């Protein structure tokens, strides 16, 4: 059995497609409390894909961010340690802020992700196997429900289909993002053979808007 948290989200749905032949236990954000109270089949779990979180970078709901992004993440990481289950966790490149030289989270979402990254670093030797991936700007199929949080690529594609043109803003050529296709993210997370650690997951090729 593979546990997939955030199974109804953009990236979670793409993991489900890739794992369609596997036995999956889906855990969505609203089910997290019930899952914590009732799930007892840890001995059947071969892998945890912890993709669930409040992902809105503009969220100011500190209570919800603390509960879902920090406390639930720490709890499921603790279960991975307790039962020695391999786990792969979705962090975020937002922990860096404007540069990659230091940690400088610019919003509460990024702070919540960095908090868990630090927790992982402190406990990394207790896991049987853990990989945390700092996703850069992921785009691809399934972004329809993300609204204003969708990638520029998704927004531009929708604009072309609806209006036949793309709306840019002044200075958009100076805004660079590392766009990475969701299928590549899924493939790398599921199939890479790197040791336990925290990794950046992007292309290393920033592109302007």
Regions found by a protein language model. Give the residues of each.
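Mid/C-terminal beta-alpha module of Rossmann-like enzyme folds, strongest
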Residues: 188, 192-209
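Glycine-rich NAD(P)-binding loop of the Rossmann-fold in SDR/ketoreductase-type enzymes
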Residues: 64-75, 107, 111-112
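N-terminal Rossmann NAD(P)H-binding glycine-rich loop of SDR-like oxidoreductase domains
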Residues: 2-19
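NAD(P)H-binding glycine-rich loop region in Rossmannoid oxidoreductase-like domains
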Residues: 38-68, 97-98
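Conserved Rossmann-fold NAD(P)-dependent oxidoreductase catalytic core, especially the SDR/UDP-sugar
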Residues: 74-108, 131
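Active-site segment of SDR-like NAD(P)-dependent oxidoreductases
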Residues: 8, 54-55, 92-100, 136-139
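NAD(P)-dependent short-chain dehydrogenase/reductase
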Residues: 108, 118-177, 182-186, 190
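Adenosine-cofactor binding site in Rossmann-like domains, unifying the SAM/SAH pocket
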Residues: 23-41
């Amino acid at each position: 059995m593979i546990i997939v948290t955030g199974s109804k989200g953009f990236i979670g749905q793409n993991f489900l497609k890739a794992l369609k032949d596997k036995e999956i236990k889906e855990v969505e954000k609203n089910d997290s409390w019930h899952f914590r109270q009732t799930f007892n089949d840890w001995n059947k779990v071969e892998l945890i894909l912890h993709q669930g979180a409040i992902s809105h970078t503009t969220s100011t709901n500190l209570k919800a961010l603390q509960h879902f992004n920090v406390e639930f993440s720490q709890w499921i990481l603790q279960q991975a340690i307790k039962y020695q289950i391999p786990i792969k966790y979705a962090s975020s490149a937002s922990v860096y802020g404007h540069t990659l030289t230091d940690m400088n989270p610019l919003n509460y979402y990024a702070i919540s992700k960095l908090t868990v990254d630090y927790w992982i670093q402190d406990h990394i030797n207790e896991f049987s196997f853990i990989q945390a991936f700092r996703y850069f700007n992921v785009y691809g199929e399934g972004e329809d429900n993300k609204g204003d949080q969708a990638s520029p690529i998704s927004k531009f594609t929708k604009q072309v289909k609806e209006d036949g043109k793309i709306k840019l803003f002044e200075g958009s050529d100076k805004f660079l993002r590392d766009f990475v296709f969701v299928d590549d993210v899924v493939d790398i997370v599921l199939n890479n053979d790197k040791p336990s650690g925290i990794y950046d997951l992007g292309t290393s090729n920033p592109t302007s808007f």
